[in-house]
Regions:
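Compositional signal for N-terminal targeting/processing segments
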Residues: 1-213
């Protein structure tokens, strides 16, 4: 909910952020949910409406709190399909990760466990959902995808990936193995859990004892 996001933002500012040097990008996973057997036109209408309502609601709340979030153009909103155009090698990476999955039994094991953690069956659609989601955020944190932000304008030194919950095992495994041999450009690679307010450093995770839920 937009109201939850505002509360999380208020935790960061001014508690964690004291200088006007940070931008925020909200990414909507609308295209990810097309991995479904539902009719495409029905899904399009459903998620277009959902993204529109959520982003406008969030935009309004950011504006209402402008005394706290003073730099309005530091907040950027984008949909999943926009990210495809931000990495010219995306399709090559996607083909490669699918090939890796077919041959890596440990990767298969972790994605199966992730599906179970989220009360899902690892169908082809669910598998494609996981692989694409993990890959795109991996590419963001590896600097292969630069998220556009009107205020930051490409000057970012690092990106903090935030989500309400623990990262799936398959996502953590992707960083630990670094199949594409991409350099680490950030001091830490991981995910900030908005619920627990703790950062999960993927390179310090023992996946055999780690719990997603």
């Amino acid at each position: 909910k937009p109201s939850n996001i505002i509360q999380w933002l208020k935790y960061f500012s001014p508690n964690k952020i004291s200088a006007p040097k940070v931008g925020v990008n909200f990414i909507y996973g609308d295209f990810l949910y097309l991995f479904s057997n539902e009719k495409a036109s029905k899904l399009k209408n459903k998620f277009t409406e959902m993204v529109w309502q959520h982003s406008n609601g969030l935009h309004d709340l950011v504006f209402r709190n402008r005394n706290l979030f003073q730099i309005q153009n530091a907040f950027s909103y984008m949909t999943w399909n926009q990210m495809y155009l931000l990495c010219r090698q995306y399709h090559t990476y996607l083909k490669k990760i699918k090939s890796i999955y077919k041959n890596d039994k440990i990767f298969q094991k972790y994605l199966k466990e992730d599906a179970k953690s989220f009360d899902k069956k690892l169908t082809k659609n669910q598998l494609d959902f996981f692989l694409e989601e993990h890959l795109l955020f991996y590419l963001v944190l590896k600097g292969q995808i630069k998220l556009p932000n009107e205020y930051i304008q490409g000057r970012e030194k690092w990106a903090l990936f935030c989500y309400p919950g623990n990262a799936p095992k398959g996502f953590v495994y992707l960083f630990q193995k670094n199949f594409f041999k991409l350099p680490q450009i950030q001091p830490y690679e991981g995910q900030y859990n908005l619920e627990t307010k703790k950062f999960i450093d993927f390179h310090n995770v023992d996946l055999e004892t780690y719990s997603v839920k």
